[in-house]
């Protein structure tokens, strides 16, 4: 019998959408998309029936109601149905459209034609089962932070090719590879991208090829910071990390080991209420928070070595 999937449809207030994306990603959903429905948002997500039972969906419904209560909005409506594998592979894609992020990026689904004219940096993306489509506030904040950070590099550090000379970045928890590709399109010379999920590593490789990025510039690997310590010849110039706050806190000492005095970092996946705990852990390990950007209940920390 072919594998089947749960298709979830969540009708919610727009203010709850980012929180729902985070909850779904943490729950293990494979592929998410959203669209406007009048004054509401309709979020679609997909879960394998091999990993998820009806009781799990009931628990998810309860957590979503609790999240709405914390935010102070009305409870979302959650419905689900079974669909075949073939339907899952294509159904969510019809709801995902090109999206401008920041001043320079355009996220373009790989199955749609490229725009005929645009001055933006186009990231072609097929996330598959990996996290990172550009829909989530944390991904947007990270791309905008990269845009700001790499635009600040002095022109003397930029070669004739447009690449920032010797600028090496680590992408920890790379997901679809969207942040790695964004950094490379902005001119970084090389990105080491790691993720504990082999499907995410494969997604990063595939999306790198979609964007004509050579394997010498984008180096994905299975694992975490411990793998980077073996791959890197020297400390990195920058770090991007868009994962859950408690994981960031656990990894900060290891990340400090791959940094040098001039290294900067961008951290997101952090709820506003978690920002102090992350900032405290950073300061205890020789980092200082330069700026905190927020979008709804999420934030992004731009930091540097102290």
Curated annotation (Swiss-Prot):
Keywords: Cytoplasm, Methyltransferase, S-adenosyl-L-methionine, Transferase. GO terms for molecular function: protein-lysine N-methyltransferase activity. Its EC number is 2.1.1.-. The keyword Transcription does not apply. S-adenosyl-L-methionine binds at residues 139, 173, 195, 242. One of its GO terms (biological process) is methylation. It is found in: Cytoplasm. InterPro entries: Ribosomal_L11_MeTrfase_PrmA, Ribosomal_PrmA_MeTrfase, SAM-dependent_MTases_sf. It catalyses: L-lysyl-[protein] + 3 S-adenosyl-L-methionine = N(6),N(6),N(6)-trimethyl-L-lysyl-[protein] + 3 S-adenosyl-L-homocysteine + 3 H(+). Pfam families: PrmA. It comes from the Bacteria. Its main location: cytoplasm. One of its GO terms (cellular component) is cytoplasm. Methylates ribosomal protein L11. Belongs to the methyltransferase superfamily. PrmA family. This is Ribosomal protein L11 methyltransferase. The lineage of its organism: Bacteria, Bacillati, Cyanobacteriota, Cyanophyceae, Nostocales.
